[in-house]
């Protein structure tokens, strides 16, 4: 990609990933430039990462979810791109993973990076407690103490989840304590009636049984971020499942609320990475 004075987003595709087009569209709405590139081509020419500010790891069913959701995709990232991705992160750039992308980041050790150590086994995203594929819209709220740059300005957001393995789990209570004490939990599932975090087993508000209602986490810098809900599925107000009622009541938002997540990343690049 020819360098321009705009935020540039690299979106890997292929091998069963399937949310790249709407992800690219969301960033384009916000004025960013995007490239959709097959993951094999990125591994073959990893120097291309130097041309981008944001790496967007999208959702889908990479490799048919064989072994575990995102596991094979994670191995590509870990063994095919470990050093280039390490430089990308150390250069102050951004990574966002959504659903399958989040699963891959966790299983590759990119997240949660406790104490800034990118190692595997510190958390996982495993089978939903419900035992079924969850496809529903849910309420989420931010952890306002988090350093996550992707969730700034968000009060509450309504987004869809689409996954069979979204339960945030940890190898020990100590790993969970370290994550929470560092305020690396970025988003929680919300019970809209009680206005409290939807901790397990508050189903379906917590759609997968995630420990302590965890819906998204970031690394200690706040720049590297993974979330189970799909921000890119709410780009237009007409994506909302109740848009007709909201329009009748005069409550239809001007834009899809998922855009705020991507906007935060784009604005961070403008403020910190563009000369």
Predicted regions and their residues:
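A short, compositionally biased
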Residues: 134-136, 181-182
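N-terminal beta1-alpha1 cap of cysteine-dependent amidohydrolase-like domains
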Residues: 1-98, 102-112, 117-120, 126-134, ...
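C-terminal and late-domain segments of enzyme folds
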Residues: 142-275
């Amino acid at each position: 990609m020819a360098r321009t004075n705009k935020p540039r987003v690299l979106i890997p595709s292929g091998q069963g990933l399937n949310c790249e087009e709407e992800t690219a569209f969301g960033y384009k709405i916000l004025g960013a430039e995007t490239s959709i590139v097959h993951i094999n081509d990125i591994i073959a020419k990893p120097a291309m990462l130097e041309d981008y500010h944001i790496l967007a790891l999208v959702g889908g069913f990479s490799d048919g979810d064989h072994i575990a959701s995102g596991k094979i995709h994670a191995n590509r990232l870990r063994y095919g791109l470990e050093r280039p991705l390490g430089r990308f992160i150390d250069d102050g750039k951004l990574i966002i993973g959504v659903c399958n992308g989040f699963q891959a980041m966790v299983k590759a050790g990119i997240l949660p990076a406790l104490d800034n150590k990118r190692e595997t086994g510190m958390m996982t995203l495993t089978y939903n407690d419900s035992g079924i594929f969850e496809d529903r819209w849910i309420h989420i709220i931010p952890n306002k103490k988090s350093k996550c740059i992707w969730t700034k300005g968000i009060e509450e957001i309504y987004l869809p989840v689409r996954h069979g393995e979204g339960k945030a789990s940890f190898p020990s209570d100590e790993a969970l304590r370290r994550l929470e004490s560092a305020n690396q939990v970025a988003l929680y599932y919300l019970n809209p009636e009680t206005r409290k975090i939807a901790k397990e087993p508050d189903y379906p508000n917590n759609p997968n049984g995630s420990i302590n209602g965890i819906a998204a986490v970031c690394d200690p810098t706040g720049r590297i971020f993974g979330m189970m809900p799909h921000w890119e599925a709410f780009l237009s107000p007409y994506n909302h499942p109740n848009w007709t009622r909201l329009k009748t009541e005069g409550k239809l938002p001007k834009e899809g609320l998922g855009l705020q997540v991507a906007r935060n990343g784009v604005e961070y690049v403008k403020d910190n990475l563009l000369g």
